[in-house]
Amino acid sequence: MQESQETHISNHLDEVVAAVSITHRKKFQNKLLQTALFQPPREKLHLCEEKAKSYSNSHEYKQAVHELVRCVALTRICYGDSHWKLAEAHVNLAQGYLQLKGLSLQAKQHAEKARQILANSIVPPYSENTDVFKFSIELFHTMGRALLSLQKFKEAAENLTKAERLSKELLQCGRIIKEEWIEIEARIRLSFAQVYQGQKKSKEALSHYQAALEYVEISKGETSRECVPILRELAGVEQALGLHDVSINHFLQAHLIILSRSPSQVEAADSAHIVAHAAVASGRHEHHDVAEQYFQESMAHLKDSEGMGRTKFLSIQDEFCHFLQMTGQKERATSILRESLEAKVEAFGDFSPEVAETYRLLGGADLAQGNHSGARKKLKKCLQIQTLLYGPQDKRTLATQQAMGMLSTAPKVASKPRQASKAKVAFCTSIPQDTLLGKARPGTTAD
């Protein structure tokens, strides 16, 4: 695996070099293309940098990385192999890779390349250049983030400490202004928080998240969109520490910021869903109303959706039913499940985990009401789907088989209350944690 990664990295360096080469295959008829071809390298570099920013702001990270690769090549042409600007181009490319999942190793490699170039570039007049020092902060921070993504927490913290120390020195020397330092410090504190969170040190992470949020609120405003991811990560740590009231409040604060920014229906639904989850996670009765309110709000945003929005609606609806069952509202949950069955068949197909689980829950509800015929019919349908999806030896299939076996003997043990009670337990309408709708894992076998 390591060998394949190294090969990929080697190939990737070739990609950067290849970006310099321009092969003239045919004459361009379009004057615009001819103009672009004969643009001076610095103009091309500026154009690529602008394109990369635009793609990144639009979350089109693959296209952004493609432009950043070209920037590295053009920067080498414009400034040479030993200029700090080339190191900066490598760091920008490393940041681009960090936005793509699974490419942290490439990001680390480019950050190391940048450090190597910078080490050979710090000679007069660079040693007096504030831009070089400001870039050095970015280099250490980017290296720290890359190491964090690779779960090398100690090395990540060391690089973040260097970035923090250098930023303070520049502030004290008057090389950067206070407002600029606050923006830098916000990013460094957030990365520190993520390092501690990665180490499962929630208490240490908490103070850094709080500091990061404070700095972002100062620099960007309390209702800026940049606050949302920090608020959610902060709330997650508070939740892990059992601070459910403040956790829910921070999730709500993030939700209100999202709503103030004219979100799409799906984005608004996701945000409300997060609040509902936080309220359920507290396990407290006083948060039940909050959970129901935001489940309902989430579903309202998606009610008339089609395609992916429709499947998301049905999944959230199932979680809401699970919540209702947990809070003793089983009849209401059963009614919603019955109404949802046809829509699930249409959205997921007849033979899907979602449909199988709904049949299982409805069968359990029928049994609880003494409707053995209805329970048997629904559980049989559930068993057919589970056998097809997971195989006859999967623990879910075996559990349904066992439940049907107990159901077939139910009339014979009607006079034995304790055994009848056990039979009902097997048909509990609560959704098991490892088989939440939409989370089923085909092929999982019995333990």
Curated annotation (Swiss-Prot):
Known partners and oligomeric status: Found Associated with the EvC complex composed of EFCAB7, IQCE, EVC2 and EVC.
Function according to Swiss-Prot or TrEMBL: Participates positively in the ciliary Hedgehog (Hh) signaling.
Gene field: TTC23
Entry-linked InterPro entries: TPR-like_helical_dom_sf, TPR_rpt, TTC23/TTC23L
Main location: other
Matches recorded under SUPFAM superfamilies: TPR-like
Cellular location(s): Cell projection, Cilium
SMART domains, per the entry: TPR (SM00028)
GO biological processes: positive regulation of smoothened signaling pathway
Keywords in alphabetical order: Cell projection, Repeat, TPR repeat
Ranges occupied by TPR repeats: 45-78, 137-170, 186-219, 356-389
Keyword Zinc attached: no
GO CC list: cilium
Species annotation: Homo sapiens (Human)
Repeat listed as a keyword: yes
Stated name of the protein: Tetratricopeptide repeat protein 23
One Pfam family here: TPR_12
